[in-house]
Amino acid sequence: MIKQIGTVAVYVEDQQKAKQFWTEKVGFDIAADHPMGPEASWLEVAPKGAETRLVIYPKAMMKGSEQMKASIVFECEDIFGTYEKMKTNGVEFLGEPNQMEWGTFVQFKDEDGNVFLLKE
């Protein structure tokens, strides 16, 4: 099952400007910085020692980004088992777990239509 809130995504116009804000002005450390193409990276920042991180994600890489809100990512150790258990319990998923370079993900909805991400 879910073990913790892993990340909260914040969608930004300028990833480098946001990176400077969170690291230089707020004082967060860079927890991850992996290239995702020529213009962006998978960027996580967090207070020193924190387990939950902010993902600073460029809006330009998201379709419909003008309507994007901050999102929560729940981490688990067995995404396929967790997916099956939650699905059996009546949770609505928006697809099946998808393996990507930086982890395996699947989206699900709560009963009010809020969308969350599950990650292994």
UniProtKB/Swiss-Prot annotation:
InterPro entries: Glyas_Bleomycin-R_OHBP_Dase, Glyas_Fos-R_dOase_dom, VOC. Residues 4-120 form the VOC domain. Coiled coil: none annotated. PANTHER family: GLYOXALASE/BLEOMYCIN RESISTANCE PROTEIN/DIOXYGENASE, GLYOXALASE_BLEOMYCIN RESISTANCE PROTEIN_DIOXYGENASE. This is Uncharacterized protein YetH. The lineage of its organism: Bacteria, Bacillati, Bacillota, Bacilli, Bacillales. The gene is yetH.
